[in-house]
Amino acid sequence: MQEQLKLETECLARSWMRHSRNTLRTYLVQDVQDPRINVQSILTRHFLIEQLFGVRFETLTEHELRFALVTNWLLRLLKKPVRPRQLHLILDALLAGGDDAEGLKIPSYVSETFATLAAPNYMCDLFCWSPVETSDAPVPEHLLSTFEVIWREVLACEEPRRASVLEPACGSANDYRFLEAFGLARLLDYAGSDLCEKNIANARGIFPDARFNVGNVLEIDAADGAYDYCFVHDLFEHLSVEVLEVAIGEICRVTQKGICAGFFNMHDGDAHVVRPVGAYHWNSLSVAKTKAIFEQYNMAASAVHVDTLLRSRFGCTDTHNKRAWTFVITRQQPT
């Protein structure tokens, strides 16, 4: 490995190893980052489901995205002091076909989602429970897990497809937890890797029978085309531009069919905006330049701006991260 790659690897490892195992265990799985309601995590699961089943579950995936939008709106409400009566007024307004709960404007995507469901439904449950009258009240686990239960039941009778899937920078099984909980993991041949030994210790502790290894995305220990699919979240912005290109090259090398890549900080400009932060980076990546890197490896990249997707499909204008993009990347077949 080149000296620059070694140095950046060491810096990245130190950046994560300074955190406690408990901090790493809960990092990126709470609040808007909870993979049950985080749109990019949901899009990743939908990517895998589509690879296995085509468009068979298209209607269910649409409902799951709507559920995420409604639940995230509720989470924002709960960050303010809220009384049970206020939630009940929202439900009353929805039942009456209204869009106003005594001065509280109900977003159109919330009203439209309610209209697609037969009552009683999960939205009745979301707005009927009684939060503690303090700020930042959590939504009960059983409500957050609504689609976890649905997917687990829907997929229960499916035979394992054994498509091989790699997740570099898997953290403490951050997304894998929900592949397992949603009944998707058993259909896949999954392998997770992370540079941080504490993350891998956490992941193995939670899932001793799953395959997790300490590994470097800059030097993946696998043959060319070893995996059918790959998914990766929140990695590339933390790399120098030179190392970013190496990481993408390695992922493309070992992936035979398709990749789903989640980015948290991208823009439509022509150049990457490089921002070193401590021992690593917090860059704003150019969509066009990043697509071009994938295309060097005979990959076709479809870039989805999450905010635009949610605006156009659901009329949702209040997503928490306007800079989030998801790339769906497929290997081009020789002509």
Stretches found by the model and what they are:
Residues P160, G225, R253-V254:
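Structured loop/turn residues at beta-strand edges in well-structured enzyme cores
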Residues M1-D221, E242-V246, C260-T335:
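Class I (Rossmann-like) S-adenosyl-L-methionine-dependent methyltransferase catalytic domain
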Residues A163, D228, K257:
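Conserved acidic residues
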Residues E245-K257:
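A short glycine-rich, Lys/Arg-flanked "PGG" loop and its adjoining helix->strand segment in the class I
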Residues D234-H238:
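Short catalytic micro-motifs in class I SAM-dependent methyltransferases
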Residues F231:
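A conserved beta-strand element that flanks and buttresses the S-adenosyl-L-methionine
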